[in-house]
């Protein structure tokens, strides 16, 4: 950061802000995320570099606002993302379920199902389990279902293997709820400690 300020290197400074914003987004620290992403946006908005950051910035903001319950802001950010890939459709389906917009959620479930049928998605177990998990969330009292616990543990393993920590972090609350409701208290404690340790490392 010091070198960027001394040299007046706008791109390097914006990249520093973006990385900080992304680190806070990874652990759902929405206020700090917003501070750094807004700095990124202000620096780059009128430059040719903005397109390089814009889509990732709005996706991360939308996903984080979704995680902390700021649903209208989440929808606004996610609607600014142009490419309808699996992860965006997953977040939009999840958000519309929480908002009670069944028709809109079904639209994105259909797109996810279609995307998962493509050859290039064949080996992506994390995405398949994310889709199955969200389908199960539509059922009443799903965290008390032993089948859900089995699914979420398979998802945990897939996310650890295939994705960054932020993907696992987004499920922390529902995982802990499932463990607690099904009296898996030791597993709940172990998972909570694992998340806490990685969160501290992510924000150092």
Features from the language model and the residues they span:
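Amphipathic alpha-helical segments of tetratricopeptide repeats
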Residues: 1-6, 38-46, 76-84, 110-120, ...
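Structural motif corresponding to the intra-repeat A-B loop/turn of tetratricopeptide repeats
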Residues: 7, 27, 68, 99, ...
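Residue signature of alpha-solenoid helical repeat architecture, marking inter-repeat boundaries
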Residues: 11, 51-52, 83, 122-126, ...
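Structural register within alpha-helical repeat arrays
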Residues: 13, 20, 61, 92, ...
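Residue register of alpha-helical TPR repeats
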Residues: 15, 56, 87, 94, ...
């Amino acid at each position: 950061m010091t070198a960027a300020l001394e040299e007046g290197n706008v791109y390097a400074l914006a990249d520093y802000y973006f990385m900080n914003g992304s680190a806070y987004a990874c652990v759902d620290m929405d206020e700090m995320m917003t501070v750094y992403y807004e700095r990124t946006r202000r620096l780059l908005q009128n430059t040719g570099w903005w397109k390089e950051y814009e889509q990732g910035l709005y996706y991360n903001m939308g996903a984080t606002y979704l995680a902390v319950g700021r649903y209208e802001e989440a929808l606004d950010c996610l609607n600014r993302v142009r490419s309808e890939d699996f992860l965006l459709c997953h977040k939009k389906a999840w958000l519309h379920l929480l908002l009670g917009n069944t028709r809109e959620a079904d639209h994105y479930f259909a797109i996810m199902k279609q995307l998962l049928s493509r050859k290039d998605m064949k080996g992506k177990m994390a995405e398949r389990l994310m889709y199955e998990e969200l389908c199960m969330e539509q059922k009443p009292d799903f965290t008390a279902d032993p089948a859900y616990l089995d699914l979420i543990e398979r998802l945990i393993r897939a996310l650890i293997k295939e994705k960054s920590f932020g993907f696992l972090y987004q499920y922390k609350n529902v995982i802990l709820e499932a463990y607690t409701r099904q009296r898996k208290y030791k597993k709940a404690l172990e998972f909570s400690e694992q998340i806490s340790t990685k969160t501290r490392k992510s924000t150092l």
